[in-house]
């Protein structure tokens, strides 16, 4: 019986020590910022609240390595010389940031994650996601620029006048919303999931082994390599396909084929 109680107490002590590894601290930001940049395996949550401190939830080791500062009007959240020794470390680095009403630039690198809960309203919004990172955001703006590369993943809801998207290096973008004008460059086995995004005027370049799905009134689509573009078009489609690429289209649109070379295919779905 004594041995049983000793083992039980040891187990409880182990659980308590494990629970005590994660601590919460507050960081009071003294400077104004309109951008957020995340570097490293950190989860940053932009919350609905508009004021208050930045809250960090992490292990003691991560707290010691975590650096939060405002530089060039950007809130930078990074890990300084941090060596991941435990699998749980990356799951316990969480930073909660209030929405100060001025945010319009979001950069996430090196396995970082940004989750933006409130809808962001700004004149221009810039989004960059690289090196196996992720972002989830809803924006209303005049101009939106999205750059996703290096096996990264983004989920974006955008209502804007114009949008410019660059996807490279096996990246993925799930896009919903609408724009008056859109320019899309999809390269290197990347994927655009935009069948629920409507564009009045669309320019789409798709190359490598990339895939793109999108809707537009007027569309200018160019595919090369082994890429595939699926376009729903209601007015005018200008299509150029080369290599082993494919353009599939649907909708009541006039079709102008400017190039259909190699083993490429342009056909109605």
Q: What does each model-found stretch correspond to?
A:
Residues 1-269:
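Intrinsically disordered, low-complexity terminal regions
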